[in-house]
Regions:
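Short, polar/acidic, helix-capping and beta-turn segments at strand->helix junctions
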Residues: 1-153
Length: 153
């Protein structure tokens, strides 16, 4: 079993409190041994850390860090319906990148989320993934990430 909070602490991070939904949904839902999160934005202490489009006023490296924040927020969402320490496999990551027209580096941005999961879970952090470019995101967020994990009973 991995102590997720300890692993986060080792890399200078802490598990945040889950953000309150901005509409009619829940942060995460469990069915069987799977937990699905709602899309998580790069909120820090309830506020958007940066807004706008990647490739305009936000660099790919900044976008990658925002995806990492989204990934942390996904773990916080998992914690609302279970315990992050029961995660046995990162199954799927879906990342949405609000980029300028012609922006095609979505995978580089979403690596910020993927790399965090690999740092924490190693081999069990390997996952299927989609990195999708979009014209806009809620609250003018540059990045949004969804997570599916398998947990033990």
């Amino acid at each position: 079993m991995i102590d997720v909070k300890a692993k986060l602490s080792e890399i200078g991070l802490t598990l945040p409190v889950a953000a309150k939904p901005v509409a009619a949904y829940v942060p995460a839902i469990r069915t069987g041994n799977l937990i699905f999160t709602a899309g998580q934005l790069p909120l820090v202490d309830g506020a958007m850390s940066l807004t706008g489009k990647i490739g305009e006023k936000i660099s790919i490296d900044q976008g990658k860090e925002l995806a990492r924040i989204c990934a942390l927020n996904c773990l916080a969402a998992v914690q609302t319906v279970g315990d992050v320490n029961t995660i046995v496999k990162i199954v799927r990551v879906v990342g949405y990148v609000n980029g300028i027209p012609g922006f095609t580096s979505q995978p580089a941005v979403i690596n910020g989320a993927s790399e965090l999961f690999l740092q924490i879970w190693g081999e069990s952090g390997k996952h299927a993934r989609s990195a999708i470019g979009v014209a806009e995101l809620p609250l003018d967020a540059p990045v949004e990430v969804e997570l599916t994990v398998e947990v033990r009973d």
